[in-house]
């Protein structure tokens, strides 16, 4: 393969691939770039090798959203969740600029070093919902206004249950309550559906308790209309990682 051909290919890459995100060997192959040629380009400084099979253009300071969309193609169910999802939709409490981004996904996954070195983040994998079908799972992921197309973010109704699942563990109970207090006009039908398939008794009961205290929704009407998973008829009690003894009644 002569140098002129390699130069032509890299020119096509530079013209055809948008800046702002990494790319992989599958994408490079669409431009006629083999793994060997990609390695050659990396050795020559035309590409930067981020990890095995993952590249970017040199001096391309790609942003978190481009990187997330790249990971979304590889990690089932990956989305911005919990506190981070609420913040992107206007519900925030003293959010620091370097605060770790909360990401959720459907399976075990370790965020790659090239991502976490640029964007402080943590990944949560938990079976929080027993989805009755894929439609509800998809319907509760959205792209808030102003964000790149197809970037997946948990809708507020889903994000708050992700937040409450982590309350007292990775998320302080006090901040969780402050964020909960910032919720406005949740969609009651969507909430009812989510509470009916939420597998965390703690998250469900904490939601019902705080919803009663804040009058966020009519809890009794919600319980009457939907088969909300509240667990047994006894109190749910647990000492959280932060030392708090949490005691929750079945219906809030």
Report residues per predicted region.
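Short linear loop/turn motifs
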Residues: 43-45, 56, 99-105, 225-228
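Exposed, interaction-prone assembly regions rather than primary DNA-binding/catalytic cores
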Residues: 82-138
């Amino acid at each position: 393969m002569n140098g002129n051909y390699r130069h032509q290919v890299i020119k096509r890459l530079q013209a055809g691939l948008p800046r702002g995100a990494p790319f992989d060997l599958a994408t490079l192959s669409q431009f006629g770039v083999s793994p060997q040629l990609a390695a050659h380009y990396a050795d020559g400084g035309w590409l930067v090798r981020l990890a095995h099979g993952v590249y970017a253009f040199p001096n391309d300071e790609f942003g978190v959203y481009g990187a997330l969309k790249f990971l979304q193609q590889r990690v089932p169910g990956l989305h911005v969740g919990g506190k981070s999802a609420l913040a992107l939709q206007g519900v925030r409490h003293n959010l620091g600029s370097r605060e770790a981004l909360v990401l959720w996904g459907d399976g075990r996954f370790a965020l790659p070093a090239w991502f976490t070195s640029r964007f402080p983040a943590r990944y949560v994998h938990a079976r929080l919902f027993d989805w009755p079908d894929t439609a509800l799972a998809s319907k509760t992921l959205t792209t808030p206004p102003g964000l790149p197309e197809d970037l997946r973010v948990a809708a507020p109704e889903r994000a708050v249950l992700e937040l409450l699942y982590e309350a007292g563990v990775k998320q302080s109970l006090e901040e969780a309550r402050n964020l909960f207090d910032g919720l406005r006009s949740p969609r009651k039908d969507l909430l009812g559906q989510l509470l009916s398939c939420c597998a965390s008794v703690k998250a469900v009961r904490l939601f019902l308790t705080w919803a009663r205290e804040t009058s966020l929704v009519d809890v009794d009407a919600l319980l009457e209309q939907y088969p909300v998973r509240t667990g047994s008829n006894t109190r749910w009690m647990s000492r959280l990682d932060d030392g708090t003894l949490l005691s929750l009644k079945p219906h809030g």
